[in-house]
From Swiss-Prot:
Stated role: Catalyzes the conversion of dethiobiotin (DTB) to biotin by the insertion of a sulfur atom into dethiobiotin via a radical-based mechanism.
Gene: bioB
Pathway(s) the chain acts in: Cofactor biosynthesis; biotin biosynthesis; biotin from 7,8-diaminononanoate: step 2/2
Lineage: Bacteria, Pseudomonadati, Pseudomonadota, Alphaproteobacteria, Hyphomicrobiales
Protein name from the UniProt record: Biotin synthase
Pfam family, any one: Radical_SAM
Length: 328
């Protein structure tokens, strides 16, 4: 295995990971894998600090995409009614609450294939107003062309989330209305506009371990790896094609977190959806393996989230404190 720099094998900006290298790391004995991941985590971050984000659904339901996991897809049979774009003042009031609760980043998500021209003035106003509160901004709005990415960048958007979800091989089994290449094109447009990239995937879609590894290799081998890598555990939502998906083995999930930390040592790795089904012990292992960001609050889009009380209790017991300043 080629040298990646650093005594624990930190990846650098030059050089690329092969699937074979990543697979060999993923298949290490569990303790060896976590030892390596935690060493890299300590080299690049304070292991007792965590970045807190708040996610708000600013436009719910009615998305024309057929993502098999998503309750907001128009193809989901769950009776979810599509909403209009949320009023700007409502978005800002929720941002004030998020900051008061300790969030340093405010993420705004809309169930669209891509934003329309008519929505751009409201979106840029949201970005500018949230930034004026001293919060980092993130949006996830579907696909972006270069023009819309530039407009969001001009408004000061810090991060754009667009997950690749899974491996290129397995992707067509989950989504048919948007190609894997479409997702990579959006990430390129975001990066070229000067916006930081947030991109990760979902475990529990029916994929194999190879798909999880390949997904992370794809992200690590982008011209610049994402600054933020969300790792989701599928929440089977009623009415979706994956409503009866089998649960993910907790230790396999921790392995993916550890591999993400090793392949992308300078990125924030975020525990995202599915934490309500994770034990405190499982989350603690994820933090040890390199996860250092999470979403706070009781809901994530249309799904449940552990809530601030449970999170505060867990972090206090682990001696982990929230980042008080925006990460560089």
């Amino acid at each position: 295995m080629p040298d990646r720099g650093g005594e624990n094998g930190a990846s650098c900006s030059v050089g690329r990971w092969s699937a074979e290298e990543a697979r060999a790391i993923y298949n290490l004995p569990f303790n060896d894998l976590l030892f390596r991941a935690h060493g890299l985590h300590r080299e690049n971050f304070d292991p007792n600090r965590i970045q807190l984000s708040k996610l708000l659904n600013i436009k719910t339901g009615g998305c024309p995409e057929d993502c098999g996991y998503c309750s907001q897809s128009a193809s989901a049979e769950n009776g979810l009614k599509a909403s209009k774009l949320m009023e700007i003042e409502t978005v800002l009031e929720e941002a004030r609450k998020a900051k008061a609760a300790g969030a340093t980043r405010y993420c705004m998500g809309a169930a669209w294939r891509s934003p329309k021209d008519r929505d751009m003035p409201a979106l840029t106003h949201m970005i500018e107003s949230v930034k004026a509160m001293g919060l980092e901004t993130c949006m996830t709005l579907g696909m972006l062309d270069s023009d819309k990415a530039e407009k969001l960048a001009d408004a000061g958007l810090d991060y754009y989330n667009h997950n690749i979800d899974t491996s290129e091989r397995f992707y067509p089994a989950v989504i048919t209305t948007r190609s894997f290449e479409d997702r990579l094109d959006t990430l390129a447009n975001v990066r070229n506009a000067g916006i930081k990239v947030c991109s990760g995937g979902i475990l529990g879609l029916g994929e194999e371990a190879e798909d999880r590894i390949d997904m992370l290799v794809t992200l690590a081998n982008l011209p610049e790896p994402p600054e933020s890598v969300p790792i989701n555990m599928l929440i089977p939502m009623p009415g979706t094609r994956l409503a009866k998906a089998a649960p993910v083995d907790p230790l396999e999930f921790v392995r993916v977190v550890a591999l993400a930390r090793i392949l992308m040592p300078k990125s924030h790795v975020r525990l995202t959806a599915g934490r309500t089904a994770m034990s405190d012990e499982m989350q603690a292992l994820c933090f040890f393996a390199g996860a250092n960001s999470l979403f706070m609050g009781d809901t994530l889009l249309t799904a449940a989230n552990p809530g601030d009380d449970r999170d505060s209790s867990l972090l206090r017991r682990l001696g982990i404190q929230a980042e008080t300043e925006q990460p560089a």
